[in-house]
Amino acid sequence: MARIAGINIPTHKHIVIGLQSIFGIGDTRAKATCKILKLDPATKVVDIAEDQLELIRAEVAKYEVEGDLRRQVSMDIKRLKDLGCYRGVRHRKSLPLRGQRTKTNARTRKGPRRLIK
């Protein structure tokens, strides 16, 4: 199992798919990383040499991923809540932020229905 940015990358998958298991790396960034390092995106992780894995680790280290990114996102949400702006209030009330209707939908965001007795 290859370990990149503190995450075990699945060895049986292609490198592009394996990189996407790291929080903060999506399809575009995974393909860009392969292009920068001149790796074939269809290469399986198990077939990649250790020196190439070191190059991948160095490239991924340039990005903000995993714990740092999660911390930044949570701090951004906390800042919105502290400001008391519309988005912060919606976060605080666990309601949709971007103008979706809430009369009939938004069950995922609101949580299960509360029983009225």
From Swiss-Prot:
Which InterPro entries is this protein grouped with?
Rbsml_uS13_C, Ribosomal_uS13, Ribosomal_uS13-like_H2TH, Ribosomal_uS13_bac-type, Ribosomal_uS13_CS
Q: Which GO terms describe its molecular function?
A: rRNA binding; structural constituent of ribosome; tRNA binding
Q: Which Gene3D superfamilies match?
A: 1.10.8.50, 30s ribosomal protein s13, domain 2
> So which domain of life are we looking at?
Bacteria
Region (Disordered) residue ranges read: 94-117
Looking up PROSITE patterns in the UniProt record yields: RIBOSOMAL_S13_1 (PS00646), RIBOSOMAL_S13_2 (PS50159)
Entry-linked Pfam families: Ribosomal_S13 (PF00416)
Q: Give the GO cellular component terms, alphabetically.
A: cytosol; small ribosomal subunit
Summarizing the function annotation, the protein's role is: Located at the top of the head of the 30S subunit, it contacts several helices of the 16S rRNA. In the 70S ribosome it contacts the 23S rRNA (bridge B1a) and protein L5 of the 50S subunit (bridge B1b), connecting the 2 subunits; these bridges are implicated in subunit movement. Contacts the tRNAs in the A and P-sites.
What family classification does the UniProt entry report for this protein?
Belongs to the universal ribosomal protein uS13 family.
Name of the featured protein: Small ribosomal subunit protein uS13
